[in-house]
Structure formats: C-alpha cells, structure tokens
C-alpha cells in the first residue's frame, strides 16, 4: 500500500457465466466513467487447493462457441423407411463424424472440444422424423483452432447431408472470446501472490482451462 501511487477500483461483474457481463459494463461506459489502466480478474477453481493461486501468461480460458445444426430430410412411416430419408441416421453419422475434428483435424498440441448436447427430432414411435436439430458447444484456445473447428464442422454436415440427398445447415456463433493474459501483468500478479501466500502455494504456469469467461 505504501508503495502504490494510484487508485484501485473493485469491479463486481454480473452474468459472467453467460459471457455478457463484461461486454454490457463496457457498453454502459465503465472505462469512460473510471480511469482504469489495467484489469486483474479472479475466479475460484474448485479442484485447486484452498489458499493456493494459479495463473499463466497467454491464453488461460477458452472461447465458447455455440452451434446449431439442422437437417431437413423426408420423414415417413417406420415400416417404409425406403420411401423417405431417415434424418436420425443422417444426424447420427454427423454426430459421430464431428468427433474426428478434434482427434484427426486439429494439431494434437492444440486445445479444442466439440460436444453435441441436444439431439431433437420431430418423429414419433412409428414415424421416421423429417427434421433433426442438434445443438452443442465447441471450445478453443486460439482463433486459428476455432476457425478450423467451424470450417470442418460445415464440411462434415454438408458432405454427409449431400451423400443422403438432404439439406443441412450450420449456425456457429462465438458467444465468449478466449481470455488472454498480458505477460507483464501476469508476472506482477504472480509476484504479489507469492509474497502473500508463499512460493509453494503459487503456480505461475497452470494448464489452461477450457471453460469460458468474459
């Protein structure tokens, strides 16, 4: 405190889990109302030891990218599958193929995740669906990786749908950018934490986390 010549503002960010809180505060004039040169953020991590501190230079949390895949096929009676195109079969092939993006299309040194979280149809017990909607969540720790995931996803959906003679579309939207720590400020925060907690309680090079914060 005695060596600090400045002002500290405490920012309590709303809606960080939905990745809109910081954007809203900035749009409402946070940095025009207050003369802020640097921002340091803290987040609890349940699997870290109580009283410990971790950070890293560069990317520390991933971008969050929500996607929606729609398949428009030709439904029909379950007893007459040859009279239509089973959208579930098409969607299932897409869901499995999407997992090859991370395992076969990304550099193994890169971090990425593709998860299908919903698979919705308009079928019934004895009716093959004509429409399938899949939604999901993709994470990446670089812009290049994110763009690769998006382009490969589109190629997979269009290719499989074309093979079955149906229409498919992808809506891929980045809802939260990745968090990238500045080098100098990260060093300052780590040194301060070591003074407070001790070197054995501080890790200045933790593994990046693929959850997302804004």
What are these model-derived regions, one by one?
Residues 2-118, 123-127, 212-213:
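Histidine/acidic-residue-rich, glycine-tolerant segments that coordinate divalent metal ions
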């Amino acid at each position: 405190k005695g060596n600090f010549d400045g002002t500290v503002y405490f920012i309590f960010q709303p809606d960080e889990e939905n990745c809109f809180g910081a954007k809203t505060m900035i749009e409402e004039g946070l940095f025009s109302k207050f003369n802020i040169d640097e921002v340091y953020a803290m987040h609890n991590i349940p699997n870290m030891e109580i009283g410990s501190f971790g950070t890293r230079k560069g990317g520390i949390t991933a971008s969050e990218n929500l996607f929606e895949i729609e398949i428009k096929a030709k439904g029909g009676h379950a007893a007459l599958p040859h009279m239509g195109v089973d959208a579930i079969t098409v969607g299932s092939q897409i869901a499995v193929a999407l997992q090859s993006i991370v395992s076969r299309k990304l550099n193994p040194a890169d971090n990425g995740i593709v998860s299908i979280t919903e698979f919705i149809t308009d079928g019934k017990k004895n009716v093959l669906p004509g429409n399938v909607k899949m939604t999901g969540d993709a994470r990446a720790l670089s812009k290049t990786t994110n763009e690769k995931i998006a382009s490969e996803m589109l190629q997979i959906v269009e290719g499989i749908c074309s093979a079955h003679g149906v229409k498919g579309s992808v809506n891929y939207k980045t809802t939260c950018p990745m968090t990238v720590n500045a080098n100098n400020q990260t060093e300052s925060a780590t040194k301060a934490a070591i003074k407070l907690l001790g070197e054995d309680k501080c890790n200045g090079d933790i593994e990046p986390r693929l959850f997302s914060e804004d």
